[in-house]
């Protein structure tokens, strides 16, 4: 039987934070990643536009014969998860429910902060998901779209970066949160600066960990977990290959990683599976 890959999609390089976790936990799985860098940031775009772009990425990955799809983007999860789950005949996993579950398992005072893109914060997806799981939780959301721009420019370290992060997260100082969800898959690449800004008493939650746990559970239930040969990784971007490869090689600690540029708008669209 042919070994089918897992598909990962994001607006840019942020989704590699899930790929990194998946490669650590599921080393025998083949993976395909698409980052739509040519059209980021998604967080400032209307939900309808994000849904259109998300379908184009999913359609591209569908032609790679994937067995499961991970929407490695909070903005796209908030806007397009129900649609993609209805349209595709494979498991589709987002990051907001996993992030919410992890936050509720972490918090002691039921005060949770969420930093994300403008689109994710305005959708109230995290506060609604957490309220559905625990009505007693108090969620404080803060849009931090500047972080995406910084990370895509590979500006992740140094005092200048720390100063900007401190300024952006300053509104959380009086919120009394004890848990902070990194509600954009780019944000774990700024973990050190974010932790410094909020202090040691606030626990950071990376939804990638719980999302890959859910992925592993789904593949196990469907008896599709790869267990034999080591997995491979193919990476595609709609933007600059050089910029993508620089961050991917650093974040995944593999200096030989390469990516290909693709135009997903030209990909043949056969319509939904169902």
From Swiss-Prot:
The keyword Electron transport is assigned to this record: no
Listed GO biological process terms: cell wall organization; peptidoglycan biosynthetic process; regulation of cell shape
Pfam families: Asp_Glu_race (PF01177)
Pathway: Cell wall biogenesis; peptidoglycan biosynthesis
Binding-site list for substrate: 10-11, 42-43, 74-75, 185-186
Isomerase found in the keyword field: yes
UniProt organism field: Latilactobacillus sakei subsp. sakei (strain 23K)
Function according to Swiss-Prot or TrEMBL: Provides the (R)-glutamate required for cell wall biosynthesis.
Gene3D superfamilies: 3.40.50.1860
Active site per the UniProt annotation: 73 (proton donor/acceptor), 184 (proton donor/acceptor)
Catalytic activity: L-glutamate = D-glutamate
Official protein name in the record: Glutamate racemase
Keywords, alphabetical: Cell shape, Cell wall biogenesis/degradation, Isomerase, Peptidoglycan synthesis
This protein's encoding gene: murI
Enzyme Commission number(s) of this protein: 5.1.1.3
GO molecular function, one term: glutamate racemase activity
NCBIfam families associated with the record: glut_race (TIGR00067)
Family assignment from sequence similarity: Belongs to the aspartate/glutamate racemases family.
